[in-house]
């Protein structure tokens, strides 16, 4: 299915740390998102503030076939990519992440497992590679893959505004630096 899940014992992973805590901070963290609107790039590198922003907003999409009644893609924001399971204010976890990124020199990437047909633009403030092994370069600038660039602009503006509205409504303790790392519509409505 489009929204399949699997679970298995941690002991099945050869290099798993069974004590529940690693000895060091990871070198790389990957956030997965599914942009059903097709405007986020397939891969982008996040600086500390952008990583905190995307962690605290937890954007993904609901698509037809994954939930009853969903006919069109719908944005969904679940702070920390698992909001119901996090009892503290998202900023607490966001700051913890920021501290770990700084102290460990961790690189953070946002991987879009959703649709292509749209890509990076100034609204989303994401660093997108110009080349990636085994990935056609035209996919990295997916705005050019849309048949209608004006439609891309319309959809991108709408999604950027959804990010802003979500942060203003639900993430009131987000620092100005982290908020500034998030998307912004280019046009004033």
Protein language model features and the residues they cover:
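Conserved NTP phosphate-binding and transfer environment spanning the P-loop NTPase/kinase superfamily
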Residues: 2-189
């Amino acid at each position: 299915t489009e929204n399949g899940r699997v679970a298995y014992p941690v002991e099945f992973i050869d290099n798993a740390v069974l004590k529940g805590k690693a000895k060091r901070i990871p070198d790389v963290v990957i956030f997965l998102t599914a942009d059903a609107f097709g405007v986020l790039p397939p891969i982008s590198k996040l600086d500390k503030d952008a990583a905190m922003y995307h962690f605290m907003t937890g954007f993904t999409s609901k698509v037809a076939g994954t939930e009853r009644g969903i006919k069109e893609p719908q944005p969904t924001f679940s702070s920390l990519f698992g909001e119901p399971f996090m009892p503290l204010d998202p900023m607490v976890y966001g700051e913890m992440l920021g501290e770990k990124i700084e102290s460990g020199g961790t690189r953070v990437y946002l991987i879009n497992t959703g649709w292509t047909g749209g890509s990076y633009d100034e609204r989303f403030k994401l660093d997108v590679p110009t080349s990636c092994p085994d990935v056609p370069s035209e996919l990295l600038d997916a705005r050019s893959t849309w048949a209608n660039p004006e439609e891309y602009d319309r959809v991108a503006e709408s999604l950027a505004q959804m990010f802003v509205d979500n942060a203003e409504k639900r993430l009131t303790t987000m620092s100005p630096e982290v908020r500034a790392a998030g998307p912004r519509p280019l046009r004033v409505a």
